[in-house]
Amino acid sequence: MSASVPADLRNLRACLLCSLVKSVESFQKEGCENCEDVLHLKGDEEKVYDCTSANYDGMIAAMSNNESWVCKWQKMQRKVKGMYAISVSGVLPNNIVSELKSLGVRYKPNQRDYSTQFKK
């Protein structure tokens, strides 16, 4: 599985849980391929804005996650192919953090790679 690569560099947002970078429209249409099981962004515009941030630094194109030293360095081996922010600013809302906690996903703001905590 892979995420759609953004066609335009304007109006992009990064997932606050896994750092995947996509347009708002893509998050609404497809959800977050790494986090959809816990965030449920697909079809929910308000949740897309709550769980993503337009404030991020740098991007990494992850195409060979298991072979790339950059993906290993950024702990992205278990994520889908796609564009990822190097760092994301923002915090998930308290109700989302509570949901994650009830699912056994520990969330600390500004820490990378939560998505591997709930992968099977």
Curated annotation (Swiss-Prot):
Its main location: nucleus. SMART domains: Spt4. It holds the Pfam family Spt4. InterPro entries: RPABC4/Spt4, Spt4, Spt4/RpoE2_Znf, Spt4_sf. CDD domains: Spt4. Keywords: Activator, Metal-binding, Nucleus, Repressor, Transcription, Transcription regulation, Zinc, Zinc-finger. GO terms for molecular function: RNA polymerase II complex binding; zinc ion binding. It is found in: Nucleus. A zinc finger (C4-type) spans 15-35. SUPFAM superfamilies: RNA polymerase subunits (SSF63393). One of its GO terms (cellular component) is DSIF complex. Residues 1-39 are annotated as: Interaction with spt-5. GO terms for biological process: regulation of DNA-templated transcription; transcription elongation by RNA polymerase II; transcription elongation-coupled chromatin remodeling. Interacts with spt-5 to form DSIF. DSIF interacts with RNA polymerase II and with the positive transcription elongation factor b complex (P-TEFb complex), which is composed of cdk-9 and cyclin-T (cit-1.1 or cit-1.2). May function as a component of the DRB sensitivity-inducing factor complex (DSIF complex), which regulates transcription elongation by RNA polymerase II. DSIF may enhance transcriptional pausing at sites proximal to the promoter, which may in turn facilitate the assembly of an elongation competent RNA polymerase II complex. Belongs to the SPT4 family. This is Transcription elongation factor SPT4. The gene is spt-4.
